């Protein structure tokens, strides 16, 4: 089982209560496909049955990075949906679930995705390639650092499992600025940085880095970090009443 952090903290207790057998889940660089069921059959949505492993497709390094962004965006959505409640009824906010979300963002997003992949392999190569895209890297690094500061703030004010009245408005403001920053940050990476990085590599280099990223993930988490992160954010959404995708369907225009 994945270990996002050590030491028996709230996240570790959370994981222990929600352990799911992962023997039939593919590696991070494989999507399982079987007829019409497709990749969504991987025990991600309730009621879906895990697919056969008879037909597997490789997942490239860039797709890996963008899927990881998908996990982080789901954390951002949790934070964004919490802001109105912090304004109106902070006592009713589940601080423990928010703490788990911040811990997931720290462990999976900041310590793994940002430090081990982007800052070690992607940004240096983009800088080396030069051009206008390379100039964006400094801003992205600054945002990484600011994000870590905000995450530590969130972890601090949510560590007791409830939100103190005095912390409600500062936390709401932190969520608003954090979400806005990372929405723009990840969008630029997906549409500018990752394509530039891919174009700077040969096909063999890209394949080698994809394998290296998987090795880093296994060393960091002891298993499939992406699949476990998807489970964790799903459980956090469930705890906060945000698991039903249909509730976010926009109403018709009037």
Regions found by a protein language model. Give the residues of each.
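N-terminal export leaders
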Residues: 26-44
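C-terminal segment of N-terminal export signals and the immediately downstream linker at the start
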Residues: 8-9, 46-79, 83-86
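Conserved alpha-helical segments that form or flank metal/cofactor-binding pockets of metalloenzymes
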Residues: 101-126, 149
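Secondary-structure edge/capping motif, primarily at the C-terminal ends of alpha-helices
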Residues: 82-90, 128-129, 154-165
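N-terminal secretory signal peptides
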Residues: 1-27
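Alpha-helical scaffold segments that form or flank carboxylate-/histidine-based iron centers
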Residues: 58-68, 93-112, 131-144, 170-182
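Preference for long, well-ordered alpha-helical segments
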Residues: 188-237
């Amino acid at each position: 089982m994945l270990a996002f952090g050590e030491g028996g903290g709230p996240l570790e207790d959370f994981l222990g209560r929600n352990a799911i057998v992962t023997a039939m889940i593919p590696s991070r660089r494989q999507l399982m496909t079987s007829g019409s069921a497709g990749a969504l059959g991987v025990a991600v949505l309730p009621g879906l049955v895990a697919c056969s492993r008879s037909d597997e497709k490789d997942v490239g390094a860039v797709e890996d990075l963008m899927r990881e962004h998908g996990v982080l965006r789901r954390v951002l959505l949790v934070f964004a949906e919490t802001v109105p409640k912090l304004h109106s009824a902070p006592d009713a906010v589940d601080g423990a679930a928010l703490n788990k979300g911040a811990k997931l963002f720290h462990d999976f997003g900041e310590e793994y995705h940002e430090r081990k992949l982007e800052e070690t392999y992607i940004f240096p190569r983009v800088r080396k390639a030069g051009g206008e895209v390379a100039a964006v890297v400094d801003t992205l690094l600054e945002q990484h650092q600011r994000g870590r500061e905000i995450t530590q703030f969130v972890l601090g004010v949510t560590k007791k499992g409830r939100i103190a009245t005095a912390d409600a408005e500062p936390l709401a403001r932190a969520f608003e600025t954090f979400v806005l920053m990372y929405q723009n940050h990840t969008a630029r990476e997906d549409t500018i940085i990752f394509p530039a990085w891919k174009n700077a590599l040969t096909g063999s280099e890209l394949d080698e880095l994809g394998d290296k990223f998987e090795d880093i993930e296994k060393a960091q988490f002891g298993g499939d970090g992406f699949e476990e992160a998807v489970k964790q954010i799903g459980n956090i959404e469930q705890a906060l009443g945000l698991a039903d995708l249909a509730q976010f369907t926009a109403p018709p225009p009037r």
